[in-house]
């Protein structure tokens, strides 16, 4: 077994996953996220930025976001990006889904009991 010390690296990849509703316009969502990444000054310009559909889940789809930053900027950039994505999604009507349970009540026609 070996231990990898990420603090010795000069750059680190930010990876964020966020759920979006199934009815979301994927093209619009990706454009918005790429714009957020472009505006974030701590993201390294010459490194790849990825926005992709990561998975289909019970209540929505998971969007993956990846970008590179200096190691010392990793946590603050990660937190700020999450907040900016949430604010921008809210402003653009993009729903972040949550698990729901639908319950149908059945009525016994003879007794009227639910």
Residue ranges and their predicted role:
Residues 6, 20-24, 28, 34, ...:
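Solvent-exposed, non-transmembrane regulatory segments of membrane-associated proteins
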Residues 10-22:
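Short glycine-/aliphatic-rich beta-strand segments at the starts of folded cytosolic domains
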Residues 1-11:
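Membrane-contacting alpha-helices and adjoining membrane-interface segments
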């Amino acid at each position: 077994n070996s231990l990898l010390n990420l603090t010795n690296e000069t750059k680190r990849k930010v990876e964020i996953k966020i759920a979006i509703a199934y009815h979301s316009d994927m093209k619009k969502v990706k454009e918005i996220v790429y714009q957020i990444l472009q505006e974030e000054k701590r993201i390294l310009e010459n490194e790849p930025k990825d926005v992709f559909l990561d998975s289909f889940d019970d209540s929505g789809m998971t969007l993956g976001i990846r970008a590179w930053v200096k190691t010392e900027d990793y946590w603050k950039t990660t937190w700020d990006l999450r907040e900016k994505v949430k604010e921008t999604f809210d402003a653009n009507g993009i729903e972040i889904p949550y698990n729901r349970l639908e319950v149908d009540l059945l009525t016994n026609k003879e007794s009227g009991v639910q």
